[in-house]
């Protein structure tokens, strides 16, 4: 294997993890033998005979190396439109139809700032699922349809030595302009490297962090994306008890039972269909999920 040194300007994954989960991720990396140097930046990459030999840091010290991997994040290239007044905070501003300040010019993907569902304002959420959906919406509107984009949420998924980490929406309220308006709930199981955090505002989920145990991560993402009021179960979500099961069951049943559901405009098929709520299948799913969850935590 390789001897790895990681240079970070402040802390590990600071843009998506809060302080506690960042420290846990750092600990997992260090257990793998990775040396982490924090609060330092690169001044120069030195070479000998055309090959990398060392990295000089901003304090003048050097880190000998034979390979450099650069992963400094995403910076939208806005030069094409920077003189048009169409720049938002970090990217090209678009409306709900993916139009820029010029109605016949559309933009989508990592270069744009779109409506962020959890933040309730424009934000640059640069990831593949968002870019893919935005591209489809932009294409439909360019072709003459009038299809609004519902908005995006930030989401990052990684794994460190088999320990999964998922970050959704707002994960560090203190970094937000209105940080005091948020409420958080946290669950920790230290011996299993488990850390879970939910972020609320006005009884709606705005973000979540899952480390080591994904639990109902998919359901949580859906609650954030749809901005479902969760006040009645807010204090019990992380316990994953019957109150959460019942809430999710009722939500699913209300959405599906007896309704004719239209495929989204971006789907190839546009044929509506009826879909009923299967009580037996849902009960079996709940039972299987609880059994699997209990086995995982006993290990």
Language model features with spans:
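A Rossmann-like FAD-binding core segment of flavoenzymes
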Residues: 2-96
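A short, glycine/Asx- and small/polar-enriched loop/turn
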Residues: 47-53, 101-102, 160-161
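C-terminal catalytic lobe of FAD-dependent flavoproteins
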Residues: 53, 61-87, 163-250, 261, ...
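Active-site glycine-centered loops adjacent to acidic/histidine catalytic or metal-binding residues
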Residues: 98, 110
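Mid-to-C-terminal Rossmann-like scaffold of FAD/NAD(P)H-dependent oxidoreductases
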Residues: 111-217, 266-298
